Amino acid sequence: MATQPPPARPPPPLTSSPYPYAAAPDIIRAHQKDAYFQGVLANRLSDLHRRLRGARSAHAWAAETRTFAAALYLCLTTLLGNRTLGEEYCDLVQVEEAPSKLFASSSSKAADDHIYENGLGGGGDGGPLLPSLPRRAGYILTAIVLPHLASRALPSVRSAIRKRLQSRLATLSRRRQQTGTKSGSGRGGRGGGGGITEYRVLRYLLTHLTPLTSGAHFRAATLAVFYFTGAYYELSKWVWGLRYVFTTRAGRVVDDDHNRHHHSPQHGGGNGGRAGYEVLGVLLVVQMAVRAWLHVREQLSSGSVAGGGGEEEEDGEDGFRERTAFGPGTNVDVSLDEHAFTSNNELLGGGGGGGGSSSQRSLGEIGAMAHTPVLKAGRARYDLGTSDKVMGWIKGAQQRKCTLCLEELKDPAATQCGHVFCWACIGDWVREKPECPLCRREAMVQHILPLRAA
């Protein structure tokens, strides 16, 4: 009788992966490279838009152009299952951080369907799971599309919240006046303690509505967590459980023994024996704590929560902060690449990438420091459309119009090359692209000079 071959035993469970998790420096380097190529693609699309539709249309749709460029870049790479140029540059592959049971269960068909050639290297020894198509599409949606939609809807949401706060404050103010009249005192009487507290809280929310709804503090906290853990560089990657691994096997990296035993995905490591950014995380946390403490101390010492003048200041802050609240931060741009123009978007606002809008000075503070009266939002100090006598030394109807908005100049400002535009128009332009719209000469935000009449 022929002896039957013994039944094939199932492969042993995969207890460790030969592909270590990527270190924080490599993740940041890959992000910088991707940000650079996204900027190049956005510039090409913007130039094409300018040639087809003109400079005014290109300027008006600059934010949409950047969003479309970023989405197109990720759709041509991540959505199709390919690596981005930054990932290829740093030898990284994006994988799912699947539960350990998926690695241990070799009979699971769901796991087998996602394993790429029995492992990332095709060597038959298993490996982490590549992200599925729905997960890749969800990542692009939450990383690019949703932030852009939120930035477009944010001004309307702020306006609605501001109207409700102002209405409630007016009601409380009238109630306090009525109570004070009945009690013979103008301070609101003893029974208005709860109303006074509510009034102060609502006044604080109204005065600081823009920084409270900017999301900059949340982005800074996300970045601080990444500095400590080195896992998720973006919040959207944490939502979809996407991490990076090195395509180079653990035995080929610099500290091979250390990587093999301590830095596999199953052991939760992955820094490859390289130093992380924990020190930066500590500094960022200290910075946020100090700013929070200074803000609380300022509110307690000045009593600005219950003070007046909040409405005028808030009206002026809208025009100043509305552009910087989500504009640059929408992309959660922590890239240090000098070619990523969106990383310089907050220069005029004075806020850093991790600090957020809380570090920006309000228009009231700037006016007090510069001894200059603050105008309400939408108003211009010098509007050449009101009269020909305003800056009459600018001759000619065409010379008195802005090339970007095609309207009469408002608060004219000149670049280093001598071209004159509206202050708001050229400020928005150089935040998106630091060059003159006419001659393409470099024009940084700190070099824009406002013109003043004699």
From Swiss-Prot:
<feature type="transmembrane region" description="Helical; Name=TM3">
    <location>
        <begin position="133"/>
        <end position="165"/>
    </location>
</feature>
<feature type="topological domain" description="Cytoplasmic">
    <location>
        <begin position="166"/>
        <end position="201"/>
    </location>
</feature>
<dbReference type="GO" id="GO:0016562">
    <property type="term" value="P:protein import into peroxisome matrix, receptor recycling"/>
</dbReference>
<feature type="binding site">
    <location>
        <position position="402"/>
    </location>
    <ligand>
        <name>Zn(2+) 1</name>
    </ligand>
</feature>
<feature type="topological domain" description="Cytoplasmic">
    <location>
        <position position="54"/>
    </location>
</feature>
<dbReference type="GO" id="GO:0016740">
    <property type="term" value="F:transferase activity"/>
</dbReference>
<keyword id="KW-0472">Membrane</keyword>
<keyword id="KW-0813">Transport</keyword>
<dbReference type="InterPro" id="IPR017907">
    <property type="entry name" value="Znf_RING_CS"/>
</dbReference>
<feature type="topological domain" description="Peroxisomal matrix">
    <location>
        <begin position="1"/>
        <end position="23"/>
    </location>
</feature>
<keyword id="KW-1133">Transmembrane helix</keyword>
<dbReference type="InterPro" id="IPR006845">
    <property type="entry name" value="Pex_N"/>
</dbReference>
<feature type="binding site">
    <location>
        <position position="419"/>
    </location>
    <ligand>
        <name>Zn(2+) 2</name>
    </ligand>
</feature>
<comment type="subunit">
    <text>Component of the PEX2-PEX10-PEX12 retrotranslocation channel, composed of PEX2, PEX10 and PEX12.</text>
</comment>
<comment type="similarity">
    <text>Belongs to the pex2/pex10/pex12 family.</text>
</comment>
<dbReference type="GO" id="GO:0008270">
    <property type="term" value="F:zinc ion binding"/>
</dbReference>
<keyword id="KW-0833">Ubl conjugation pathway</keyword>
<dbReference type="GO" id="GO:0005778">
    <property type="term" value="C:peroxisomal membrane"/>
</dbReference>
<keyword id="KW-0812">Transmembrane</keyword>
<comment type="pathway">
    <text>Protein modification; protein ubiquitination.</text>
</comment>
<dbReference type="InterPro" id="IPR001841">
    <property type="entry name" value="Znf_RING"/>
</dbReference>
<feature type="transmembrane region" description="Helical; Name=TM4">
    <location>
        <begin position="202"/>
        <end position="229"/>
    </location>
</feature>
<feature type="binding site">
    <location>
        <position position="422"/>
    </location>
    <ligand>
        <name>Zn(2+) 1</name>
    </ligand>
</feature>
<keyword id="KW-0962">Peroxisome biogenesis</keyword>
<dbReference type="Pfam" id="PF13923">
    <property type="entry name" value="zf-C3HC4_2"/>
</dbReference>
<feature type="binding site">
    <location>
        <position position="436"/>
    </location>
    <ligand>
        <name>Zn(2+) 2</name>
    </ligand>
</feature>
<feature type="topological domain" description="Peroxisomal matrix">
    <location>
        <begin position="230"/>
        <end position="276"/>
    </location>
</feature>
<feature type="region of interest" description="Disordered">
    <location>
        <begin position="302"/>
        <end position="329"/>
    </location>
</feature>
<feature type="binding site">
    <location>
        <position position="439"/>
    </location>
    <ligand>
        <name>Zn(2+) 2</name>
    </ligand>
</feature>
<feature type="transmembrane region" description="Helical; Name=TM2">
    <location>
        <begin position="55"/>
        <end position="76"/>
    </location>
</feature>
<keyword id="KW-0576">Peroxisome</keyword>
<protein>
    <recommendedName>
        <fullName>Peroxisome assembly protein 10</fullName>
        <ecNumber>2.3.2.27</ecNumber>
    </recommendedName>
</protein>
<feature type="region of interest" description="Disordered">
    <location>
        <begin position="171"/>
        <end position="194"/>
    </location>
</feature>
<dbReference type="InterPro" id="IPR025654">
    <property type="entry name" value="PEX2/10"/>
</dbReference>
<feature type="topological domain" description="Cytoplasmic">
    <location>
        <begin position="297"/>
        <end position="454"/>
    </location>
</feature>
<dbReference type="InterPro" id="IPR013083">
    <property type="entry name" value="Znf_RING/FYVE/PHD"/>
</dbReference>
<feature type="binding site">
    <location>
        <position position="417"/>
    </location>
    <ligand>
        <name>Zn(2+) 2</name>
    </ligand>
</feature>
<feature type="topological domain" description="Peroxisomal matrix">
    <location>
        <begin position="77"/>
        <end position="132"/>
    </location>
</feature>
<feature type="transmembrane region" description="Helical; Name=TM5">
    <location>
        <begin position="277"/>
        <end position="296"/>
    </location>
</feature>
<keyword id="KW-0862">Zinc</keyword>
<feature type="binding site">
    <location>
        <position position="425"/>
    </location>
    <ligand>
        <name>Zn(2+) 1</name>
    </ligand>
</feature>
<feature type="zinc finger region" description="RING-type">
    <location>
        <begin position="402"/>
        <end position="440"/>
    </location>
</feature>
